[in-house]
Amino acid sequence: MNILKISKQTLTNNIKIIREYVGNAKICFPVKANAYGHGIEEIVENTHDLVDFFAVANSLEAFRVTAITKKPVLVFGVIYYEYLERMVSENIRVSIQDYDDIEKLEQIAKELNKKIYVHINVNTGMNRMGVCYNDVCRTIKRAYNSKWIILEGVYSHLACADNRDHPTNAKQKKRFSEIVEYAKELSQDIICHLSNSYGFLGDKEICYDMVRPGILIYGFLPEFYVERSIREIKPIARLLSKVVKIIELEEGDGVGYSMIYRGFDGEKVAVIPIGYGDGFPRELGDRGFVNIDNVMYPMAGRMSMDGLTVSLGHNEHNVKVGDVVELISDIPRNRNSAFLMAKQVNTIEYDIMSTLNDRIIREVI
């Protein structure tokens, strides 16, 4: 059985540190992609009293959040009109991505006789989603003056927040500051938000009314310098499994598909029941490490859909069937941390964690 163990104390402490850092800004907690692989239900249940908003990528994720909490939920993605009636009934916040969205929303709101909460997503330079920068002011004004729309927020997203010196940051910040000025002239109550985790860590001046600390709450820090208080943030989860079988190799034996790993006579190999079918990175096969009783062991051979193997050498530490295996550590410097695993396979921690699927149990402790 594979379990992602989540520390409620660490989760709570991370939010507390961020809260102190951003001052009066609200916290909108992104829990998209199954809370970056940590489990929407488990994370929302244990944080809804600590944050002001939640954010998700789509309607179906939003419904999972509203089943647990009455806190506002913002959907970042496009509007799926087949789900809009339920979204409106549950007061889920919709993102306007184009000026024409307003007319469609007004028509549906009239039919339902219920106002729709919206946040206008502004394309300040990322060029992925959002209202065109040159079309923003009329979109804001139209939404603000609508009888059927409640303009709750205006936001954008930084394309290069992980690189503080990238020139795109200055361009986007300048554009968004102009938008904020326009929106606030209409109403001081409009919530303006720009910064994800790396955004406000790189520039504390752009917290505005709300920040969106996703990866930071889950415990992953940027590689650029941050203040000492932020360095107290820790990963909230460990991925654990157990040894289910130990095999002794004979001379010439290989392990796993294609026999890419060849052991030595008498070598012990442990079988762990987790594989790429669980969302564990296949690229780590024959490259990654696991921790058994505070000893690091290398993976041996290709990872399969449902299992991986590790070399115990001569098994000097007497690893046994049933021993706990730590696959992902909550200590960043460990070779099996999400941070160093990501480095090994040329990806990011978000990718390592968010691909873990529902074959893995989530447990908050």
From Swiss-Prot:
Pathway(s): Amino-acid biosynthesis; D-alanine biosynthesis; D-alanine from L-alanine: step 1/1
InterPro entries: Ala_racemase (IPR000821), Ala_racemase/Decarboxylase_C (IPR009006), Ala_racemase_C (IPR011079), Ala_racemase_N (IPR001608), PLP-binding_barrel (IPR029066)
Alphabetic keyword roster: Isomerase, Pyridoxal phosphate
GO biological process: D-alanine biosynthetic process
Domain of life: Bacteria
GO molecular function, one term: alanine racemase activity
Sites bearing N6-(pyridoxal phosphate)lysine, chain numbering: K32
Required cofactor names: pyridoxal 5'-phosphate
Cited SMART domains: Ala_racemase_C (SM01005)
Active site: K32 (proton acceptor), Y257 (proton acceptor)
Cited HAMAP family: Ala_racemase
This protein's name: Alanine racemase
Gene (UniProt): alr
